[in-house]
Amino acid sequence: MTDRYAVFGHPVAHSKSPQIHATFGRQEGIAVDYRAIDLAPDAFLAGLEAFAADGGVGANVTSPHKEAAFSVCTTLTARARRAGSVNTLLRKGDRWHGDTTDGIGLVRDLTDRHGLDLRGRRMLLIGAGGSARSVAPAFLDAGITELVVVNRTPERADELIDAMGEPGRAISRYWEDLRELGDFELIVNATSAGRDRDVEFKLPLSLVNSMTTAVDLNYGEAAIAFLAWARAANCRNTVDGLGMLVEQAAESFLQWHGVRPQTDEVYQTLRQGAAVLAGED
């Protein structure tokens, strides 16, 4: 039976992951059968098991399934356990092993590709779902001074902060308190609100200072609304999630195939097709 790989999401037709992994496979001389599988939340667990029965040995997981993927894993990496979220699955026998590569992928993109020094920065994280949980630990590990999490459901933000285990550096605040939070060198949107074409981000301009970098974990059309706000607010840099996507994919590829591919070629190819969302202003 041929080994199969996939990305699970809902929706997922827009995903660039099949293209990315096909390119990585060509670079490394590895035949890769990788496809996108759209499953509604109530169909995810059954769909994942059907995938395994049909030769599935590795998978990426995107919104809204990252926390559900965490729950099915028998073994987890330390960073996945801390995040409570999984975006990379590896089949070991008849069980799943889970990891989260989003955080390390995003930090690598920001530091290596965009030249940002994250040490000493004050960071605002908007959202507290699986995507937010997957990146928060990596930013703390990268040396940010303070992580402030806001979410429309405050209990979710509290849960995320509790999972970080660093009460002196990571705190949650109410959405209604945004105007009172001061300014930040890093603002990260980890919500999926931008998938609604009619959405408009109306965040306080007081969040922005002369050094602010705004990051959206989404890419393509889903990142337009937040990055439009960031540019209008005169953020120094705006970065979408394309680089994170490529870098986390490389980390997944390494776990599945034992080699970490070069990422610049596939990033530049994808970026040329998304010029409207240029990584930096």
Swiss-Prot record:
<protein>
    <recommendedName>
        <fullName>Shikimate dehydrogenase (NADP(+))</fullName>
        <ecNumber>1.1.1.25</ecNumber>
    </recommendedName>
</protein>
<dbReference type="GO" id="GO:0004764">
    <property type="term" value="F:shikimate 3-dehydrogenase (NADP+) activity"/>
</dbReference>
<dbReference type="GO" id="GO:0008652">
    <property type="term" value="P:amino acid biosynthetic process"/>
</dbReference>
<feature type="binding site">
    <location>
        <position position="87"/>
    </location>
    <ligand>
        <name>shikimate</name>
    </ligand>
</feature>
<dbReference type="InterPro" id="IPR041121">
    <property type="entry name" value="SDH_C"/>
</dbReference>
<feature type="binding site">
    <location>
        <begin position="151"/>
        <end position="156"/>
    </location>
    <ligand>
        <name>NADP(+)</name>
    </ligand>
</feature>
<feature type="binding site">
    <location>
        <position position="102"/>
    </location>
    <ligand>
        <name>shikimate</name>
    </ligand>
</feature>
<feature type="binding site">
    <location>
        <position position="219"/>
    </location>
    <ligand>
        <name>shikimate</name>
    </ligand>
</feature>
<dbReference type="InterPro" id="IPR046346">
    <property type="entry name" value="Aminoacid_DH-like_N_sf"/>
</dbReference>
<dbReference type="Pfam" id="PF18317">
    <property type="entry name" value="SDH_C"/>
</dbReference>
<comment type="subunit">
    <text>Homodimer.</text>
</comment>
<keyword id="KW-0560">Oxidoreductase</keyword>
<comment type="pathway">
    <text>Metabolic intermediate biosynthesis; chorismate biosynthesis; chorismate from D-erythrose 4-phosphate and phosphoenolpyruvate: step 4/7.</text>
</comment>
<keyword id="KW-0028">Amino-acid biosynthesis</keyword>
<comment type="function">
    <text>Involved in the biosynthesis of the chorismate, which leads to the biosynthesis of aromatic amino acids. Catalyzes the reversible NADPH linked reduction of 3-dehydroshikimate (DHSA) to yield shikimate (SA).</text>
</comment>
<keyword id="KW-0521">NADP</keyword>
<dbReference type="GO" id="GO:0005829">
    <property type="term" value="C:cytosol"/>
</dbReference>
<dbReference type="InterPro" id="IPR022893">
    <property type="entry name" value="Shikimate_DH_fam"/>
</dbReference>
<dbReference type="InterPro" id="IPR011342">
    <property type="entry name" value="Shikimate_DH"/>
</dbReference>
<comment type="similarity">
    <text>Belongs to the shikimate dehydrogenase family.</text>
</comment>
<dbReference type="InterPro" id="IPR013708">
    <property type="entry name" value="Shikimate_DH-bd_N"/>
</dbReference>
<feature type="binding site">
    <location>
        <begin position="15"/>
        <end position="17"/>
    </location>
    <ligand>
        <name>shikimate</name>
    </ligand>
</feature>
<dbReference type="Pfam" id="PF08501">
    <property type="entry name" value="Shikimate_dh_N"/>
</dbReference>
<dbReference type="Pfam" id="PF01488">
    <property type="entry name" value="Shikimate_DH"/>
</dbReference>
<dbReference type="GO" id="GO:0009423">
    <property type="term" value="P:chorismate biosynthetic process"/>
</dbReference>
<feature type="binding site">
    <location>
        <position position="217"/>
    </location>
    <ligand>
        <name>NADP(+)</name>
    </ligand>
</feature>
<dbReference type="GO" id="GO:0019632">
    <property type="term" value="P:shikimate metabolic process"/>
</dbReference>
<dbReference type="InterPro" id="IPR036291">
    <property type="entry name" value="NAD(P)-bd_dom_sf"/>
</dbReference>
<dbReference type="InterPro" id="IPR006151">
    <property type="entry name" value="Shikm_DH/Glu-tRNA_Rdtase"/>
</dbReference>
<feature type="active site" description="Proton acceptor">
    <location>
        <position position="66"/>
    </location>
</feature>
<dbReference type="GO" id="GO:0050661">
    <property type="term" value="F:NADP binding"/>
</dbReference>
<feature type="binding site">
    <location>
        <begin position="127"/>
        <end position="131"/>
    </location>
    <ligand>
        <name>NADP(+)</name>
    </ligand>
</feature>
<feature type="binding site">
    <location>
        <position position="62"/>
    </location>
    <ligand>
        <name>shikimate</name>
    </ligand>
</feature>
<feature type="binding site">
    <location>
        <position position="241"/>
    </location>
    <ligand>
        <name>NADP(+)</name>
    </ligand>
</feature>
<keyword id="KW-0057">Aromatic amino acid biosynthesis</keyword>
<dbReference type="GO" id="GO:0009073">
    <property type="term" value="P:aromatic amino acid family biosynthetic process"/>
</dbReference>
